[in-house]
């Protein structure tokens, strides 16, 4: 049996881009029109559960026999706060409810990163310029080589250990991501004085988080302060590693595409949708996996519809997959383990100044095809 040839960005016609855009817009419009009580009930339940896990965790960590359960409970609380609640609320998924506490303009999460900073680096830069090399800073976070088209430098030999460090301290790396520290330390296009000034509001939030977890709650524990300090440290570590792993598995498996800057010149709605499809990947799992990942297990659907409540992605996914099959586009998904393995293989490969993969030729083809596509559109 002959294998079906999948389309790439450059092989689609303007009419196909337009059709894909219309079909995905129809899904989005239908979902927006259907938002209502079940969505409000869902997010209220998530907030309630997150608070219950936090209270239970902080109490149990002060009781030696239940300390380990307390660490686990607080870890779940922090993951829910960041993934299923904070990330999604800050995308404006629940702004329509008119509740100040769940409005993207007001929400502040349990993270060293300020919500204001996150909405710049993530909501705007990453979601607008998804996987566009030179515009999406999430491609390596200024730290790693995550694209075949990034010029290799000796520092990238440390890709693997630096990725471990990034996972370990993820909340602090994203907190300072907007500083683009590599521009001062490596490329000398920013000064230390600029970095220091821009760091002030970030440090204010980081201090609050550090004081809460490592001073306030340990102090409340009295003689058990070391146990609470350690428990908070482990809960933050669990949240950091899990959040980073989820994000990496949605963006860096080997079959996920990256694009030259020319792709976004005169980009149509349909072309934007296709770029999101080709630049994202899902991983499979049950309901608990979806909740704990903030439904970023449906990273493709999230990039297509970032302002649709994430718990809806499971029902949207079959329609998106059908559209991909209809137009010959790959729908990239796999188990969490498979996506993790693929991601780390890519990280390892790109640490070396080795030959480039076949993806480069496709990206070059994209670049060459863009001008006539844009004119025809």
For each feature predicted by the language model, list its residue ranges.
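Low-complexity, highly charged intrinsically disordered N-terminal segments
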Residues: 1-56
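Membrane-embedded catalytic scaffold of the fatty acid hydroxylase/desaturase
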Residues: 76-197, 264-354
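Non-transmembrane, extramembrane segments of multi-pass ion/lipid transporters
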Residues: 27-37, 182-192, 258
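Short, intrinsically disordered terminal tails adjacent to the first/last structured region
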Residues: 1-8, 362-377
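Feature representing long, continuous alpha-helical segments
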Residues: 213-217, 227-247, 271, 275, ...
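Alpha-helical bilayer-embedded segments of polytopic membrane proteins, i.e.
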Residues: 41-82, 156-172, 197-245
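Extended hydrophobic/aromatic segments used for targeting, binding, or gating
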Residues: 218-219, 227-268, 353, 362-372
């Amino acid at each position: 049996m002959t294998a079906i040839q999948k389309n790439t960005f450059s092989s689609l016609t303007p009419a196909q881009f337009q059709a894909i855009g219309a079909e995905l817009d129809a899904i989005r419009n239908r979902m927006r029109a259907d938002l209502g009580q079940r969505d409000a009930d869902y997010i209220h339940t998530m907030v309630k559960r997150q608070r219950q896990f936090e209270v239970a965790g902080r109490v149990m960590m002060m009781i030696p026999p239940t300390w380990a359960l307390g660490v686990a409970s607080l870890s779940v609380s922090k993951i829910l706060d960041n993934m299923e609640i904070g990330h999604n609320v800050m995308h404006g998924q629940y702004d329509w409810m008119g509740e100040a506490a769940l409005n993207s303009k007001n929400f502040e999460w349990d993270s060293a990163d300020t919500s204001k900073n996150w909405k710049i680096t993530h909501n705007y830069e990453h979601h607008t310029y998804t996987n566009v090399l030179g515009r999406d800073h999430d491609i390596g976070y200024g730290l790693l080589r995550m694209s075949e088209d990034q010029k290799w430098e000796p520092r990238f030999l440390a890709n693997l250990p630096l990725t471990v460090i990034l996972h370990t301290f993820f909340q602090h790396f994203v907190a300072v991501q907007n500083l683009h520290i590599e521009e001062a330390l490596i490329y000398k296009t920013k000064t230390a004085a600029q970095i220091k000034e821009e760091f002030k509001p970030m440090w204010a939030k980081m201090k609050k988080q550090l004081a809460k977890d490592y001073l306030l709650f340990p102090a409340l524990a009295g003689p058990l302060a070391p146990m609470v300090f350690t428990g908070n440290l482990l809960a933050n570590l669990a949240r950091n590693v899990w959040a980073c792993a989820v994000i990496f598995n949605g963006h860096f498996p080997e079959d996920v595409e990256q694009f030259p800057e020319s792709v976004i010149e005169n980009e149509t709605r349909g072309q934007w949708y296709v770029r999101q499809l080709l630049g994202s990947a899902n991983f499979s799992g049950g309901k608990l996996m979806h909740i704990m990942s903030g439904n970023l297990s449906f990273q493709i659907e999230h990039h297509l519809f970032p302002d649709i409540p994430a718990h809806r992605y499971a029902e949207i996914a079959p329609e998106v997959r059908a559209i991909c099959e209809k137009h010959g586009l790959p729908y990239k998904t796999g188990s969490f383990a498979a996506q993790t393995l693929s991601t780390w293989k890519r990280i390892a490969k790109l640490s070396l100044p080795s030959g480039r993969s076949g993806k480069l030729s496709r990206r070059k083809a994209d670049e060459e095809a863009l001008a006539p596509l844009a004119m025809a559109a």
